[in-house]
A protein has these predicted regions:
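Short carbohydrate-recognition loop motifs
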Residues: 48-71
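Extracellular beta-strand ligand-recognition surfaces/modules
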Residues: 108-113, 149-150, 155-159, 163-203
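Extracellular carbohydrate-recognition regions
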Residues: 20-43
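Extracellular/lumenal carbohydrate-interaction signature centered on repeated Trp-anchored short motifs
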Residues: 75-86, 160-163, 184
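Sec-dependent signal peptide recognition
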Residues: 2-10
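Hydrophobic h-region of N-terminal signal peptides that target proteins for export
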Residues: 9-18
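Extracellular ligand-binding interfaces
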Residues: 93-162, 202-207
């Protein structure tokens, strides 16, 4: 299966929650989830099951991917000159130990967030950075997708040192697009969440919370 299909065939709705220094991307409510319409990735046997929950820090999205792949996405304009930092709080309850994530057969992640920049007339020409919660690699590692050089996998968290616990991470998306794609990006066009296990045929359980962009 082509990873470009995974990234760019997601269902997007347009929305924008913003303040001077922060842009919130997802609300993680039942109403929002119903609007996003989970769509199965072409070639996957099943859809990832997404559901809404809550804890003392607010709402979260739970994903269960059992030999499955589907994603949630939003078209949202992010001014990377004002708010270049993506902030993600997430947790992995069941990971994908033993897979080789930089190969086609092992290119699955219990949790990932795509930052997408439109760079052409068609979705297949877009560029993406795939911020991942790895099951096997160290934080700070990165590599081109085994399916396309237009997407780069960048490990922000790893179950090697953060398993079954909430962890918050941050990355400068503007600098990342320059580093990985040699692009000077002033505005981001979309963000997508996906938990997928269709290549490895395994099962993962993950949680997402508080995904937003900030000035610092």
């Amino acid at each position: 299966m082509k990873i470009l299909v995974k990234i760019f065939a997601l269902v997007f709705i347009s929305i924008n929650f913003s303040s001077a220094n922060e842009v919130k991307v997802f609300e993680f409510t039942e109403s929002e989830l119903s609007q996003l319409q989970v769509r199965k990735v072409r070639g996957a046997d099943k859809k990832t099951v997404y559901s809404i929950g809550a804890n003392e820090n607010g709402n979260y999205l739970k994903s269960v991917a059992d030999n499955a792949a589907s994603g949630l996405g939003k078209e949202i304009k992010i001014d990377l000159n004002k708010t270049p930092f993506i902030n993600i709080t997430w947790k992995i309850e069941q990971d994908l130990k033993g897979i080789k994530e930089n190969t086609k057969k092992g290119h699955d992640f219990a949790a990932r967030v795509f930052a997408v920049k439109k760079t052409g007339a068609t979705p297949l020409s877009n560029r993406a950075i795939n911020y991942v919660f790895s099951s096997n690699n160290d934080v700070g590692l990165n590599w081109p997708s085994p399916y396309t050089k237009k997407s780069v996998d960048n490990v922000l968290s790893s179950t090697k040192n953060s398993f079954s616990e909430w962890v918050t991470v941050k990355s400068n998306v503007k600098e990342d697009f320059k580093k990985f794609h040699d692009l000077d990006v002033n505005e981001l066009d979309g963000l997508a969440i996906m938990s997928d296990t269709d290549n490895s045929k395994m099962k993962s359980i993950a949680y997402y919370q508080n995904i937003y962009f900030s000035a610092e």
